[in-house]
């Protein structure tokens, strides 16, 4: 599995602000989008381009253009919605596929409850977004679902990842790419990432 921890100063600064205990919903939501945008920039750096000729202001000019790769952004409900717009800033024509999976707070196991996926998944790059990679259960279940529908090319973007989740994800899906803003220390007994961000979904939606 390709693992990239994006260490750009802007990413580190913005993530540091998100860790503040008293951060308000508006600021947390804005920063989730901004870091999602920066992670997308990094994750799409290997997209193929081709030369095409267009009519410029002074006649024909040869330019680079993305080589017809279809993209779908896949937010995992509900917290993943907080990073979706960051992806769409760079790939505004991307289709949106939605997967609903929540974590049982007692067993920590993923429980699927909803899916609405783009067509032709086998032809698309799926960019899966979720702020936290904790145990990895929800992410693994989502990737299982996407692959069952024919998806072959997957990149995962998360704000914060725990070593335990990274290990589990690599064991289950070694062929995917994972981009994160930080690899944190560990999971606590409740399955939360330490130091982490707290409950990202509650902070994005203002329900904490």
UniProtKB/Swiss-Prot annotation:
GO molecular function annotations of the record: GTP binding; magnesium ion binding; uracil phosphoribosyltransferase activity
Cofactor(s) listed: Mg(2+)
Residues given in the record as uracil binding sites: 193, 198-200
Reported regulation of activity: Allosterically activated by GTP.
GO biological process terms, semicolon-separated: UMP salvage; uracil salvage
Reaction it catalyzes: UMP + diphosphate = 5-phospho-alpha-D-ribose 1-diphosphate + uracil
Residues that bind 5-phospho-alpha-D-ribose 1-diphosphate: 78, 103, 130-138, 199
Alphabetic keyword roster: Allosteric enzyme, Glycosyltransferase, GTP-binding, Magnesium, Nucleotide-binding, Transferase
Xref: InterPro entries: PRibTrfase_dom, PRTase-like, Upp_B, UPRTase/APRTase, Ura_phspho_trans
The protein's Enzyme Commission number: 2.4.2.9
Note on how the cofactor is bound: Binds 1 Mg(2+) ion per subunit. The magnesium is bound as Mg-PRPP.
Biochemical pathway: Pyrimidine metabolism; UMP biosynthesis via salvage pathway; UMP from uracil: step 1/1
HAMAP family assigned to the protein according to its UniProt record, in alphabetical order: Upp_B (MF_01218_B)
Role description: Catalyzes the conversion of uracil and 5-phospho-alpha-D-ribose 1-diphosphate (PRPP) to UMP and diphosphate.
Family: Belongs to the UPRTase family.
Protein name, entry field: Uracil phosphoribosyltransferase
